[in-house]
Amino acid sequence: MSQGSIVQCIGAVVDIHFPRDAMPKVYDALKLDASEANGMAEDGLTFEVQQQLGDGVVRTIAMGSSDGLRRGMKVNNTGAGISVPVGMGTLGRIMDVLGRPIDEAGPIDSTELRVIHQPAPKFDELSSSVDLLETGIKVIDLICPFAKGGKVGLFGGAGVGKTVNMMELINNIAKQHAGLSVFAGVGERTREGNDFYHEMKDSNVLDKVAMVFGQMNEPPGNRLRVALTGLTMAERFRDDGRDILFFVDNIYRYTLAGTEVSALLGRMPSAVGYQPTLAEEMGRLQERITSTKVGSITSIQAVYVPADDLTDPSPATTFLHLDSTVVLSRDIASLGIYPAVDPLDSTSRQLDPQVVGEEHYSVARAVQMNLQRYKELRDIIAILGMDELSPEDKLAVSRARKIQRFLSQPFHVAEVFTGSPGKFVSLKETIKGFKGICAGEYDHLPEQAFYMVGGIEEVIEKAKTL
């Protein structure tokens, strides 16, 4: 085990000098020598090698606070990458980027360690599935259905409901789904991690979830690697032949941490100040989130959209890797329709008559057609009013407004705020309801009856009280 010494420290980037014949490899983990404990620097602080500068000097990223570091401190090379505990011992526990417990419940009961940098599965090991994953959320099941073993992105700007949607999906899928889940909190608020933990605990599914957090207050090195730590744990369960759910909140913060690290490493920024290696970093993470012939990983990722601009390089790079995209819209949220999913912008590869069936496909397209027609007529209505429309257009607008309201739904996780009990709507019920609206079976009901309800039966009941 070779030993080196710190020669330069700029924020989270630390340069360490080693003997020329014992230079660490890129991605090797280095540890601060125990003799350097001075009450200021973090005990056993880990560094990850990013670049070899030559002449025995390596440039590293500190996986923790670099406060208290000074030149000349001794650092040991572990000779391997960052390794984290994997397996059943991680379930029900909260860990940091290095796999250390942060829930004050004693050490992790796992003897097996795995390096966080792994190659993606080979092409001949991959498997594709066309089974649908029912979420119980009407707009998602109808317009952008999820595939088992697929990748889903929840796109949205600040405050349109990404995390609430993610929590509802966890609530509906993880609780129904008998398998295991891994949750990676990447650069999000600590409060959200705390809420998630208690939500899981109260619903007795904590023993089926492994949680890894690298929150907003952590150094960029932690936020950059925490997604890989969570993924490594999920891969281990998948390789045991299980079907895993992998939740990431938020992929954008992973990119942002990469931008910070890239700037500190002195790389030239590319478009909008992002790192030049953006596509490669995203690909390295996303290509590992996949299903093999042994087991599957279904991943649901929240993606923050800076300034509501979907063409920003970060969300645009993420789009390429996904099977379903759920786009949350500020315009829809401002109408008070939640979940604020934009049915005209959201897409899914599964929405194909050969996968979902002819009926589902035609109902989904009819819903989109009605909403698109309403969107086109909105300017005319704003200027001339409803009276100037032809009878056919009036009918189309009336149905579209009912569809728009029927796409809203009370969530279980938002019960505390809304006071109305959450609803899980089966796919069969969803298709039946929208098919009826498009066919004009409910033209006589007032549009208020369609707002914030579950199935179509509830609409009929609600209409009686209005």
UniProtKB/Swiss-Prot annotation:
Nucleotide-binding among keywords: yes
Described function: Produces ATP from ADP in the presence of a proton gradient across the membrane. The catalytic sites are hosted primarily by the beta subunits.
Family: Belongs to the ATPase alpha/beta chains family.
Organism of provenance: Dechloromonas aromatica (strain RCB)
Keyword presence, Protein biosynthesis: no
A molecular function GO annotation: ATP hydrolysis activity
Membrane topology of this protein: Peripheral membrane protein
Enzyme kind, highest EC tier: translocase
Gene name of the record: atpD
Keywords: ATP synthesis, ATP-binding, Cell inner membrane, Cell membrane, CF(1), Hydrogen ion transport, Ion transport, Membrane, Nucleotide-binding, Translocase, Transport
Cellular component GO terms, alphabetical: plasma membrane; proton-transporting ATP synthase complex
Catalysis: reaction(s): ATP + H2O + 4 H(+)(in) = ADP + phosphate + 5 H(+)(out)
SMART domains: AAA (SM00382)
PROSITE patterns: ATPASE_ALPHA_BETA (PS00152)
Primary localization class, coarse: membrane
EC number(s) per entry: 7.1.2.2
Pfam families per UniProt: ATP-synt_ab, ATP-synt_ab_N, ATP-synt_VA_C
Protein residues bound to ATP: 156-163
Name of the protein: ATP synthase subunit beta
